Each structure stands twice: as structure tokens, then as C-alpha cells.
Amino acid sequence: MYKTKGGFQLTLQTLSLVVGFMAWSIIAPLMPFIKQDVNVTEGQISIILAIPVILGSVLRVPFGYLTNIVGAKWVFFTSFIVLLFPIFFLSQAQTPGMLMASGFFLGVGGAIFSVGVTSVPKYFPKEKVGLANGIYGMGNIGTAVSSFLAPPIAGIIGWQTTVRSYLIIIALFALIMFIFGDTQERKIKVPLMAQMKTLSKNYKLYYLSYWYFITFGAFVAFGIFLPNYLVNHFGIDKVDAGIRSGVFIALATFLRPIGGILGDKFNAVKVLMIDFVIMIIGAVILGISDHIALFTVGCLTISICAGIGNGLIFKLVPSYFSNEAGSANGIVSMMGGLGGFFPPLVITYVANLTGSSHLAFIFLAVFGCIALFTMRHLYQKEYGSLKHS
């Protein structure tokens, strides 16, 4: 019975995450269409694309905590109701300010990530948590759904009507969660400040947050900037750019459970070190690529490593912070979201300063190298020599 309930709630919450991420990411794939109707500069575009990440990151901490207090059902339901307003406002946007305001509150769709990673592990034994969280993380595919479907639909019915169609989906899932959400979910009522005090003293939280800042940050950042970047720098058609961006997102999403499985079967930190070495290579490839073929190889390498890395990290979070899982999940996932905020701005700034975005990708490789040192430190403190696992 409990196993059946766990499977059902995992499915329900994963689909809810799909819908949340569809809303969170709707602006990026439609930007090539939006900028034809709204007068925006390239600098404004980079800010508009990055803004949804702010609230989508910061709210992950209270959302994770509230999930332990009231349960996933009510956090999901309330989030969907709130999302109806910025989606409608976006469909009416006529100025950069309106785009920024609606994008900011669309961040609620990204914040719900911490709801499931806090709730789902309650339904599964410890040895299955990595896989369960990996499956839930596949809800990130919502970003790819918007990338794949929004541009061709917008080409037929217009971007405003495309955005308004999301109102139906969001309202439907609010109703589904209200009816089928689990009111009997186990609650964990540890005072927030007590959790924060405990977490602040644990260096593992800082390491995991930094690693997720890179892996999930890369996932979010590439999903945000790729559609517009491919159109501007390689002259790719708007719909084709959306599809290519969707492939990046889908690949990372489907590989996330693989990361969870690897974390369940092997030492997650050791596997993560291998993953980051390959990611660094991918970043270097992007840093030297001037042709679309080489750029594609670099992007796919980053996509694979980001997806597997995301799954590995969220295998480790509940293992290290069982009593403070909600807050720890929120903090780590918040840092991952913020990791997606800065790269589009940095890429635009570096491109304006140097005439090329190559240096920005090299920064990713440098951040990855620093992460490797922290992983080695954690591994040696937890398990001893790297020669033994």
C-alpha cells in the first residue's frame, strides 16, 4: 500500500514539476518572437531571461521548509494558483518592464523543485532515494517541452496566445493536485532557525551548494541563453534554435535518474569527480569553438555531465541531512537556480567587452576545477584515500 502510494505521488509530483518548469522557462524560447513586438535591447534581453531565476531560486528554501510543515499538496496547489497571474500578465506585455515583472513572478514555477525533493524521499527506502529523486528531477523536462513546442505554436497562433494557453494547463494541475495530493504525508516540524543553525555549521552543505551551482546552473543557463544565442551568433532559424535548445535540456533531464542510480550503486562523490572532469573538457571545447559543429559537441558534453551531476548531488543531500532535508534541499536547489542567473549576464558582458563569448565558457571550466578540489577534500575526510572506496 505504502509502496503504491509512493509510486503515485512520485508520478503526480513529477508531472507537477514538468508544468512548473514549463511556466518558469516560457520566456526564453519565445524571446525571438517577443522582441519582434516589444522594443528591447540585447542587454535588456539578457536581464529579462535571467530574472525568472531570482525568485525561482530564493523561494526554494521556504518552499522546502513549508513542504515538511504542510505537505507537498498545498505548496504545489498554492504555487499553481499564484502562477496564473504572471502568465496572464506576460501575455499582455508591451514593454521591457512588463516582461521583467511577469518573468520575476514566473520564478514560482522554478521554486517548486524543492517541494518534491523534500517530499518524495519520505515514500521510499534509503537505497532507492537516489533513483526516486532522479525520476522526480526529470520534471525538468518541462523546460524542454516549452523549448520544443512553444516556438512552432507561436509561429502559428502568435506568442501571446501561446502564453495564454498555459493558463489552462496550470489551472488543470491546480485542480488535480487539490484532488489527488497526499494529505497524510509525514510532517517534520523542526523550527526553521534551529535547522539553519545546524546546517550553517556543516561544511558539506557549502560544498553541495557550490557543486549544484555549477551543474544545475549550467542546465538553467544554457536553457535560457541558447535559443537567442544560436539565432544571433550562428544565424539559426528561430524554431530550429528552440529545438536544439530542447535537445540540450531533454538530454540533461533524462540522464538525471542515471546520476541517481550511479549514486545508489557506487560512491557518489567519486563518480561526481569523474563527471566534473568530463564537464571541464566540454567547457574548454566551448571556449575554443567558432563552428556550430564543435559548439554542439561542447553543449552536448555539458548537457550529459550536468544531468548526471544533478542526480548525483541530490542523492547526497538526503544522505547527509536527513533531519534537515527540507531546508537543505531548499538551500542547495536555491544555489543551483542562482547558478543559472549569472551566466547569461556574464556571456553578454564578455561578448560586448571582447567581441567573443569564449572567455565566459572558460570561466565554467575554472569553476569546475575549483569544485574538484572541494570534492577531493570531502572524499578524503569521509572515506580516506582516493585509492579506496
Curated annotation (Swiss-Prot):
<dbReference type="Pfam" id="PF07690">
    <property type="entry name" value="MFS_1"/>
</dbReference>
<keyword id="KW-0812">Transmembrane</keyword>
<dbReference type="InterPro" id="IPR036259">
    <property type="entry name" value="MFS_trans_sf"/>
</dbReference>
<feature type="transmembrane region" description="Helical">
    <location>
        <begin position="161"/>
        <end position="181"/>
    </location>
</feature>
<feature type="transmembrane region" description="Helical">
    <location>
        <begin position="69"/>
        <end position="89"/>
    </location>
</feature>
<dbReference type="InterPro" id="IPR044772">
    <property type="entry name" value="NO3_transporter"/>
</dbReference>
<feature type="transmembrane region" description="Helical">
    <location>
        <begin position="294"/>
        <end position="314"/>
    </location>
</feature>
<protein>
    <recommendedName>
        <fullName>Probable nitrate transporter NarT</fullName>
    </recommendedName>
</protein>
<feature type="transmembrane region" description="Helical">
    <location>
        <begin position="268"/>
        <end position="288"/>
    </location>
</feature>
<dbReference type="GO" id="GO:0042128">
    <property type="term" value="P:nitrate assimilation"/>
</dbReference>
<feature type="transmembrane region" description="Helical">
    <location>
        <begin position="211"/>
        <end position="231"/>
    </location>
</feature>
<feature type="transmembrane region" description="Helical">
    <location>
        <begin position="331"/>
        <end position="351"/>
    </location>
</feature>
<feature type="transmembrane region" description="Helical">
    <location>
        <begin position="139"/>
        <end position="159"/>
    </location>
</feature>
<comment type="similarity">
    <text>Belongs to the major facilitator superfamily. Nitrate/nitrite porter (TC 2.A.1.8) family.</text>
</comment>
<feature type="transmembrane region" description="Helical">
    <location>
        <begin position="97"/>
        <end position="117"/>
    </location>
</feature>
<keyword id="KW-0534">Nitrate assimilation</keyword>
<feature type="transmembrane region" description="Helical">
    <location>
        <begin position="246"/>
        <end position="266"/>
    </location>
</feature>
<dbReference type="InterPro" id="IPR011701">
    <property type="entry name" value="MFS"/>
</dbReference>
<keyword id="KW-1133">Transmembrane helix</keyword>
<feature type="transmembrane region" description="Helical">
    <location>
        <begin position="14"/>
        <end position="34"/>
    </location>
</feature>
<feature type="transmembrane region" description="Helical">
    <location>
        <begin position="353"/>
        <end position="373"/>
    </location>
</feature>
<keyword id="KW-1003">Cell membrane</keyword>
<feature type="transmembrane region" description="Helical">
    <location>
        <begin position="45"/>
        <end position="65"/>
    </location>
</feature>
<dbReference type="InterPro" id="IPR020846">
    <property type="entry name" value="MFS_dom"/>
</dbReference>
<keyword id="KW-0472">Membrane</keyword>
<keyword id="KW-0813">Transport</keyword>
<dbReference type="GO" id="GO:0015112">
    <property type="term" value="F:nitrate transmembrane transporter activity"/>
</dbReference>
<dbReference type="GO" id="GO:0005886">
    <property type="term" value="C:plasma membrane"/>
</dbReference>
<comment type="function">
    <text>Probably required for nitrate uptake under anoxic conditions. Also possibly involved in excretion of nitrite produced by the dissimilatory reduction of nitrate.</text>
</comment>
